[in-house]
Amino acid sequence: MALPEVRLRFPARWLAFGWAGLCAVISVRSASAQGTFSTILTNGPTAKRLNLVLLAEGYTAAQQATFRADATNVVNNLLNVPPYQSYRRYFNAFAIFVPSNQTGSDHPSQSYYRDTYFNSTYESYGVSDLVTIPPNDRDSDYSHGQGRVDALLQAQMPQYDLAILVVNDLSYGGSGGQIIVTSKSSASSKIVIHESGHTLAKLGDEYSDSFPAFSGPEEPNTTQETRRDFIKWKAWIAPATPLPTPAASAYASAVGLFEGAHYQATNWYRPKLDCMMRTVGVPFCEVCSEALVKSIYQHVRPVESYSPGVTNLAITNRQTLTFGLTPLQPNDHPLTVRWLTNGVTVGGATGASLNLYPLALSNGIHQVRAMVQDDTVLVRNDPSGLLGQTVNWVVQVNLAPAWAKLAPPLRLRDGRFQVSLTGQAPGGFLLQGSTNLATWTTLASNVLSSGTFEFIDPATNYRGRSYRAVLPP
């Protein structure tokens, strides 16, 4: 059965404007309540994740566990749909519980009023399933609704990116605006998905029905442009697709230019015949999915961490230096990694680390670069490079010249040879021995960065033996 769509055909940004009205029950408790804070989903530090916060409305003190279960369902319903499901690891989710005196929400036409903390109500602005909190057409006082939300968010999770108010009412309904409001009805989960498109990616409604006095600029998924080369989603349009595109089943799966969007039946266009931003329950189209993925990367970067954490380095010895990073991998595909030294790609280096050998570099300044990219098929147009991140290190190599002097070997009374090595090599020497000057065996490694090194060869069965000091490879 098709889900109701009437609620969603109300421009979200209009909800910021309310006017004075009467509501039978208004909660006038202090807006300074701290609430109970808990974690639903954690994938990383809040500074490096997109943070969802869910708040309880119409749940009594005895229903805290019920709210947590309902809030978890809201999170799962959102993050289990494309494109969010690919980037679930990029999200955290938290809950703030403040008890209400009564369960549910107001239904004014039924003379049903509840004493709840955020004073939510159905039937806002004459729309039966439009659920809002003040300021609205029934109560213009910001402090009775949105002000309480803002105070809790500021106190408990100022790093939030998306706030969702979960209303303990089984009737279908919700709204968008500064926050998303949704009832606990399973059908209402689609409202959260739709409204997240507005909040995160600034997507527009694709409805054709007129809404009085609605205006505004183009959104990522709406346009008045009809010239193929200037359409913002032209990368998704096949050359054979006619523009404007007929609203016919033959083009149901095509990205094109379909007339009717932005609350206008004519002269405004959308990318696809149908989409979540037009019909509840339909998946996001390619253009909207692309905008959502890019919006995720506006909040979360693809490199979780890197080392060395200092990006200006000085090397004065020949020890191997390891560079590494931790890519934030999506759930269903890997990020690609490239390493470059002095602008040249290192062949075969596609993993999370790179070993740098100072001996392979001349003294002076060198650059090491790691480039991480999400090559998802969901994005074709990324002019700002949101899906990639580059980490640069500047390496100053300053190795002192190596020199060595071997004293003639001294045969000891027990038949062994003693070797004295004097010299300097920041990475040390390999001391090698041979009986034929063709085959050399390493006797000691990483010896003598500077000064004198004394070595006694344990072998006693050689009548003669040659020794040499070489730099390690």
Predicted regions and their residues:
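Short, composition-biased motifs enriched in small/polar/acidic residues
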Residues: 398-473
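Active-site recognition of the HExxH zinc-binding catalytic motif
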Residues: 189-206
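Propeptide-to-catalytic entry region of secreted or membrane-anchored zinc metalloproteases
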Residues: 34-152, 183
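Short pre-active-site segment immediately N-terminal to the catalytic Zn-binding motif
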Residues: 64-67, 173-193
